[in-house]
């Protein structure tokens, strides 16, 4: 797609400042992201959380404008909890992703500057990638943000749909660390979330230390 004028500026804002990774395997989904927040070329915060949870079994990764991301996160939680208290019952991961895509598409002329991965486990593992225009794709593996070209190279080379959830978590960690080494807007460490049928587990990694 050719991006012109203001759209190019928006794309640059979304790409600049983070690396997030999502991987889907048979027994779950892994979401991972670095911890650095940038303001231009300035490191604004070294310990930002970019992996968030809607429920114990549904998570998201975030890239883009912090204010817009906070609003979108609230929207996603409200979508889930509203459905839960109505006759329709809990909404599926695909349903949440589709609702968010509709919101983003409806506001594309005054867009929220975000790129979101939504992943989790309902009756099966699901992983969706959404951009600020509301485009939505279901993925087996994906990387977003300024370090995504580096991270995606690692994923392309090593992803195997038959790998275990632990192997996928290790791959996601290494993909983000590869971006940290080559992308100045990605840094500090990595949060890795393993989401499966019973809930989620979260690990934090730093260059020379596991927390």
Swiss-Prot record:
Catalytic reaction list: Cleavage of peptide bonds with very broad specificity
Prosegment residue ranges: 1-17
EC class of the enzyme, as a word: hydrolase
Active site, UniProt feature: 18 (nucleophile)
Protein purpose: Component of the proteasome core, a large protease complex with broad specificity involved in protein degradation.
Assembly behavior: The 20S proteasome core is composed of 14 alpha and 14 beta subunits that assemble into four stacked heptameric rings, resulting in a barrel-shaped structure. The two inner rings, each composed of seven catalytic beta subunits, are sandwiched by two outer rings, each composed of seven alpha subunits. The catalytic chamber with the active sites is on the inside of the barrel. Has a gated structure, the ends of the cylinder being occluded by the N-termini of the alpha-subunits. Is capped at one or both ends by the proteasome regulatory ATPase, PAN.
Family, similarity comment: Belongs to the peptidase T1B family.
Name of the protein this chain belongs to: Proteasome subunit beta 1
Lineage of origin: Archaea, Thermoproteota, Thermoprotei, Sulfolobales, Sulfolobaceae
């Amino acid at each position: 797609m050719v991006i012109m004028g203001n759209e190019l500026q928006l794309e640059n804002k979304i790409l600049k400042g983070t690396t997030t990774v999502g991987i889907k395997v048979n027994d779950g989904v892994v979401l991972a992201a670095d911890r650095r927040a940038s303001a231009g070329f300035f490191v604004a915060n070294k310990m930002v959380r970019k992996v968030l949870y809607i429920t114990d079994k549904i998570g998201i990764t975030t890239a883009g404008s912090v204010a817009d991301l906070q609003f979108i996160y609230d929207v996603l939680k409200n979508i889930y909890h509203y459905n839960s208290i109505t006759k329709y019952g809990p909404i599926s991961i695909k349903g949440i992703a589709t609702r968010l895509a509709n919101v983003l598409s409806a506001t594309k002329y005054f867009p929220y500057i975000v790129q979101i991965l939504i992943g989790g486990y309902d009756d099966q593992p699901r992983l969706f990638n959404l951009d600020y225009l509301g485009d939505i794709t279901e993925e087996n593996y994906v990387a977003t943000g300024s370090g995504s070209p580096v991270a995606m190279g690692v994923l392309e080379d090593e992803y195997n749909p038959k790998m275990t959830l632990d192997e996928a978590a290790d791959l996601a960690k290494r993909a983000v660390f590869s971006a940290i080494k080559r992308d100045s807007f990605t840094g500090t460490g990595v949060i890795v979330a393993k989401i499966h049928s019973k809930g989620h587990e979260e690990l934090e990694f730093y260059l020379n230390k596991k927390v």
